[in-house]
């Protein structure tokens, strides 16, 4: 590949502009004291039926906490203890941490798909 073609490809990506990810997770960062509760919000605007919450602990892969296959339908994943979820609409799937423990220090991810 020539340098000229590579530069054009890089510039094309830069000019593409921002893209809406379709899934919004808030808050981005949160620090809790042991015993505190909190809710992580997850919203998607793509009309996806499937939504899921994952956690990734240091040195480990993603582990499924809870998932949903449609509004009003939720189920437990691999590590559901200490968490509650609800799915009153297709768009929203909040994850509630009931009582923070040091073992729940993790990176949390929400995902959606068809």
UniProtKB/Swiss-Prot annotation:
Disulfide bonds, paired cysteine numbers: 42-110
Domain of life: Eukaryota
Any GO CC annotation of this UniProt entry: plasma membrane
One annotated GO biological process: cell surface receptor signaling pathway
InterPro entries: Ig-like_dom, Ig-like_dom_sf, Ig-like_fold, Ig_V-set, TCR_beta_variable
SMART domains: IGv
Carbohydrate attachment residues: 84
Claim: Signal is one of the keywords in the record: yes
PROSITE patterns hit by this protein: IG_LIKE
Location in or out of the cell: Cell membrane
Predominant subcellular localization, coarse grouping: membrane
Ig-like domain location: 22-114
Record keywords, A-Z: Adaptive immunity, Cell membrane, Disulfide bond, Glycoprotein, Immunity, Immunoglobulin domain, Membrane, Receptor, Signal, T cell receptor
Cleavable signal peptide: 1-21
Role noted for this protein: V region of the variable domain of T cell receptor (TR) beta chain that participates in the antigen recognition. Alpha-beta T cell receptors are antigen specific receptors which are essential to the immune response and are present on the cell surface of T lymphocytes. Recognize peptide-major histocompatibility (MH) (pMH) complexes that are displayed by antigen presenting cells (APC), a prerequisite for efficient T cell adaptive immunity against pathogens.
Summary of subunit composition and partner proteins: Alpha-beta TR is a heterodimer composed of an alpha and beta chain; disulfide-linked. The alpha-beta TR is associated with the transmembrane signaling CD3 coreceptor proteins to form the TR-CD3 (TcR or TCR). The assembly of alpha-beta TR heterodimers with CD3 occurs in the endoplasmic reticulum where a single alpha-beta TR heterodimer associates with one CD3D-CD3E heterodimer, one CD3G-CD3E heterodimer and one CD247 homodimer forming a stable octameric structure. CD3D-CD3E and CD3G-CD3E heterodimers preferentially associate with TR alpha and TR beta chains, respectively.
Protein name (Swiss-Prot/TrEMBL): T cell receptor beta variable 6-5
Species this chain originates from: Homo sapiens (Human)
This protein's encoding gene: TRBV6-5
């Amino acid at each position: 590949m020539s340098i000229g073609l590579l530069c054009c490809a890089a510039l094309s990506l830069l000019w593409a502009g921002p893209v809406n990810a379709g899934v919004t997770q808030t808050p981005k960062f949160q620090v809790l004291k042991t015993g505190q509760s909190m809710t992580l919000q997850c919203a998607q605007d793509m009309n996806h039926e499937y939504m899921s919450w994952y956690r990734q602990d240091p040195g480990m892969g993603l582990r499924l906490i809870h998932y949903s296959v449609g509004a009003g339908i939720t189920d437990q994943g691999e590590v559901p203890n200490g968490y509650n979820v609800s799915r009153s609409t297709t768009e929203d799937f909040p994850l509630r941490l009931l009582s923070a423990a040091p073992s729940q220090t993790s990176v949390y991810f929400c995902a959606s798909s068809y």
